[in-house]
């Protein structure tokens, strides 16, 4: 009998490194997770130690195989998914980082972005990289490291230094420095990559003074990049054959591989991505244009919108307002009332993200009357997550001209049946919740497995995409539009709160 084979997904996130073993039926066999230190040298600055990222990720790989009691020769392939935009520069000769990893959340390069704005580069960046000019992305982070570590510009030009996002760093370490690659999804988050020519953008490299010599080769999201012999019993060299940034991996894990398919991840905030097929749609409505994975890991495009406050607004109810003891309680209290009694909560605690991009908006509660109680406010806070999702979806439909027929959902808050039903009601579309909630790891596993023939094609995977529950709209169009109009009015009044009158 042939020995049973498995796929390992490495999921390198912002606060922890995880490894997940899956079998051919996409069942999760074992999981290992290790947290690592968040470094805050100054307000608004966020760093990670690249060696700690590597140590935690490599140890979870060993642990996850031991937990499942399988040897490395039973692993058909490894797939990698990662926190996007986080930037690492290291020495080619020694493999030592020349500075800590600058994390996607870090705002230290705001001044560099202001200079680029003054130089009139905003439109060029949006048109060619698909991104908005913001410290979020890798390009200005690389420049900052080269500007602040003595001698590094010259060393980079001599080919002595290498740059990579987290996927690139992990593969470099796993292959003992033999392979320096990234995939199209991660490259598209650097602000250095032209999403139309599918090559590094010479103008952006020149503007930021980043030598091409230090950049990784950009490859498809599903192919064999190299092999590793790290991890567990047995000495087999395991192919590394899938890479995707975390949100694109979730999109693929949800099998949103056709034009017009979309997923929303409900975490601290919300990330919604819609696959736009072979067409890069330039957003006129505050969204990002990014690269996603097609059916065999080839380049597709997507529109992406980020909402800042989703699960975080439930935490606010619990930690600051003390209205609930546990996030799970929110559903119970929300369903104790029939509606919000006219109340709208706009959770703009740190401003508003897509599609408004208003850093001066602030949180507000509107429509308070004498009959309003705590349950109404809890319900209105949950509803705000669904309203913000509709805001992003309306922008996506306006940009793409595509009408969404079903939204696939994942993340912690999807366990809340009230929220999922209201999401369906307010969108006027089906909401599909999958049985397997580990969709980010699943996406990386699928990409890796397809590359080595572990799964033959996407049709085989469609059978495994079991929808645990489907939510369908339960309110009339007039009621839906009336409620949404109230939300829009509330948002308008919360905007520009911090701005002072001239």
Curated annotation (Swiss-Prot):
Per its record, what are the GO molecular function terms?
Answer: ATP binding; glycerol kinase activity; metal ion binding
Q: Does the keyword Zinc apply?
A: yes
Write out the entry's keywords from A to Z. Answer: Allosteric enzyme, ATP-binding, Glycerol metabolism, Kinase, Metal-binding, Nucleotide-binding, Transferase, Zinc
Q: Name one GO cellular component term.
A: cytosol
Enzymatic reactions? glycerol + ATP = sn-glycerol 3-phosphate + ADP + H(+)
Keyword tRNA processing in annotation: no
Q: Where does ADP bind?
A: 14, 18, 268, 311, 412, 416
Question: What positions does the entry give for glycerol binding?
Answer: 84-85, 136, 246-247
Q: Which residues does the annotation say bind ATP?
A: 14-16, 268, 311, 315, 412
Q: What is its EC number?
A: 2.7.1.30
Quote the record's activity regulation.
Activity of this regulatory enzyme is affected by several metabolites. Allosterically and non-competitively inhibited by fructose 1,6-bisphosphate (FBP) and unphosphorylated phosphocarrier protein EIIA-Glc (III-Glc), an integral component of the bacterial phosphotransferase (PTS) system.
Q: Could you tell me which pathway this protein works in?
A: Polyol metabolism; glycerol degradation via glycerol kinase pathway; sn-glycerol 3-phosphate from glycerol: step 1/1
An example Pfam family from this entry, by short name, is: FGGY_C
What job does the chain carry out? Answer: Key enzyme in the regulation of glycerol uptake and metabolism. Catalyzes the phosphorylation of glycerol to yield sn-glycerol 3-phosphate.
Q: How does it assemble?
A: Homotetramer and homodimer (in equilibrium). Heterodimer with EIIA-Glc. Binds 1 zinc ion per glycerol kinase EIIA-Glc dimer. The zinc ion is important for dimerization.
Q: Which NCBIfam families does UniProt cross-reference here?
A: glycerol_kin, PRK00047.1
Q: What is this protein called?
A: Glycerol kinase
Source species: Shigella flexneri
């Amino acid at each position: 009998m042939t020995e049973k084979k498995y796929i390992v997904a490495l999921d390198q996130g912002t606060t922890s490194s995880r490894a997940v073993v899956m079998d051919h039926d996409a069942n999760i066999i074992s999981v290992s997770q290790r947290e690592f230190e968040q470094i805050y040298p100054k307000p608004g600055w966020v760093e990670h130690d690249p060696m700690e990222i590597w140590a935690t990720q490599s140890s979870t790989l060993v642990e996850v195989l031991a937990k499942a009691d399988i040897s490395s020769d039973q692993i058909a392939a490894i797939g990698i998914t990662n926190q996007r935009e986080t930037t690492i520069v290291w020495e080619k000769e020694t493999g030592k980082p020349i500075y800590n990893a600058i994390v996607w959340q870090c705002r230290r390069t705001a001044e560099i972005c202001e200079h680029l704005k003054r130089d009139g580069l905003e439109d060029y960046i949006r048109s060619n990289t698909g991104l908005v000019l913001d410290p979020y992305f890798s390009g200005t982070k690389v420049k900052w490291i080269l500007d602040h570590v003595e001698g590094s510009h010259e060393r980079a030009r001599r080919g002595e230094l290498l740059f990579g996002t987290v996927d690139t760093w992990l593969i470099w370490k796993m292959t003992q420095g033999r392979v320096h690659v990234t995939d199209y999804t991660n490259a598209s988050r650097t602000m250095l990559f032209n999403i139309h020519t599918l090559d590094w953008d010479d103008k952006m490299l020149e503007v930021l003074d980043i030598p091409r010599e230090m950049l990784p080769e950009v490859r498809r999201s599903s192919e064999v990049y190299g092999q590793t012999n790290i991890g567990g019993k047995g000495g087999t060299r395991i192919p590394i054959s899938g890479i995707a940034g975390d949100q694109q991996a979730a999109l693929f894990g949800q099998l949103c591989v056709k034009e017009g398919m979309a997923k929303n991840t409900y975490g601290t905030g919300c990330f919604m991505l819609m696959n736009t097929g072979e067409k890069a749609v330039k957003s006129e409505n505050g969204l990002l244009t990014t690269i996603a994975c097609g059916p065999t890991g080839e380049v597709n495009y997507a529109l992406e919108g980020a909402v800042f406050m989703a699960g975080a607004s439930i935490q606010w109810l619990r930690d600051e307002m003390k209205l609930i003891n546990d996030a799970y309680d929110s559903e119970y209290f929300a369903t104790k009332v029939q509606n919000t009694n006219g109340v709208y909560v706009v959770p703009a605690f740190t401003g508003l993200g897509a599609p408004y991009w208003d850093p001066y908006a602030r949180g507000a509660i509107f429509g308070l009357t004498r009959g309003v109680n705590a349950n109404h406010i809890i319900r209105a806070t949950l509803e705000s997550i669904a309203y913000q999702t509709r805001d992003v979806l309306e922008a996506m439909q306006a940009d793409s001209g595509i009408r969404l027929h079903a939204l696939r959902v994942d993340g912690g808050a999807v366990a809340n049946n009230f929220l999922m039903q209201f999401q369906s009601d307010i969108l006027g579309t089906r909401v599909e919740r999958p049985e397997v909630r580990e969709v980010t790891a699943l996406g990386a596993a699928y990409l890796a497995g397809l590359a080595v023939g572990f799964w033959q094609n996407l049709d085989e995977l469609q059978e495994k995409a079991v929808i645990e529950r489907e939510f369908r709209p339960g309110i009339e169009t007039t009621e839906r539009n009336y409620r949404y109009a109230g939300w829009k009015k509330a948002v308008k009044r919360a905007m520009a709160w911090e701005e002072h009158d001239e």
